[in-house]
């Protein structure tokens, strides 16, 4: 609450101009977004959001961090798409067409989150868990995940795989990779194999564009062509891999999705 007040004061924003406070959390919420049911990375269960926001004197909205990033990425993408339209009528026809604009967002962070947006709407599922791609099994009886299960996508492609588990930072890992350190090359090849396996699974299931964001993504951009080639090899039908891309939003822009 004090941090919120400090930010508002520092930027000379009047209280009446504050629309609200958005809070992003890496966890699963209930259907009303009033309780954080489970956050594996934070080790929290059934935490009432009201406890988090009670001292903040503004309207608050808490949401899953990956969904917030996905929202921001979607609107950022649409903003530039709309710049190519000739007039308002073109935009209205596009919005009213009902044509699918399916987009899956995968966030590579300390954990691995996901979100699915179709026809400008975030798909939430029956239990508000749609998009928990990080807990899709890619190696049965494999590595232990923070959720307590084994073989999860997250256990193989989170930032920890390339940093904490290698006793280095992401910067140091990719520096060693550029220096052709054999150990780091082996880890990275395994990482890309697991990453493309998961992305291919998502594409097979949902047949929509897949966007990868989060702290790890910027380090992977130089390998985009290699990743697409691997995706082409793994896909059962015809594709050139162009359905895959990296997020365009910066971390600061992504915050607007909350």
Regions found by a protein language model. Name each.
Residues 26-29, 109-111, 216-217:
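Short glycine-rich anion-binding loops that position phosphate/pyrophosphate groups of nucleotides
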Residues 1, 54, 61-63, 72, ...:
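Glycine/GP-enriched mid-protein hinge/lid loop-to-helix segment characteristic of carbohydrate kinases
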Residues 231-245:
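Charged, glycine-enriched surface loops/patches
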Residues 17-19, 108-110, 240:
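Short, basic and Ser/Thr-rich N-terminal targeting/leader segments
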Residues 1-15, 155, 163-222, 242-254:
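Adenine-nucleotide phosphate-binding core of ATP-dependent small-molecule kinases
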Residues 24, 139, 213:
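Conserved residues at the C-terminal ends of beta-strands
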Residues 1-11, 17-21, 27-104, 221-234:
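Glycine-rich phosphate-binding loop and adjoining helix at the ATP-binding site
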């Amino acid at each position: 609450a004090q941090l919120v007040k400090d930010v508002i004061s520092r930027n000379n924003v009047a209280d009446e101009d504050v629309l609200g406070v958005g809070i992003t959390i890496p966890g699963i919420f209930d259907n009303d977004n009033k309780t954080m049911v489970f956050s594996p990375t934070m080790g929290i269960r059934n935490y009432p959001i009201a406890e988090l926001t009670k001292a903040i004197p503004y309207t608050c909205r808490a949401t899953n961090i990956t969904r917030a990033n996905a929202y921001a990425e979607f609107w950022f993408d649409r903003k530039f798409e709309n710049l190519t339209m000739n007039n308002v009528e073109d935009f209205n026809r596009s919005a009213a067409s009902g044509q699918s604009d399916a987009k899956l967002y995968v966030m590579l962070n300390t954990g691995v989150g996901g979100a699915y947006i179709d026809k400008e709407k975030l798909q939430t599922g029956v239990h508000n868990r749609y998009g928990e791609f990080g807990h899709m099994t890619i190696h049965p009886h494999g590595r232990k995940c923070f959720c307590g299960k084994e073989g999860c996508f997250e256990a193989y492609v989170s930032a920890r795989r390339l940093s904490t588990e290698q006793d280095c930072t992401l910067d140091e890992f990719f520096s060693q990779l550029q220096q052709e350190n054999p150990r780091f090359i082996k880890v990275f090849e395994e990482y890309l194999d697991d990453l493309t396996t998961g992305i291919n699974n998502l594409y097979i299931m949902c047949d929509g564009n897949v966007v990868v964001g989060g702290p790890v993504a910027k380090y992977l951009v130089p390998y985009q062509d290699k990743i697409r080639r691997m995706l082409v090899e793994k896909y059962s039908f015809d594709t050139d891999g162009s359905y895959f891309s990296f997020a365009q939003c910066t971390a600061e822009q992504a915050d607007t999705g909350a």
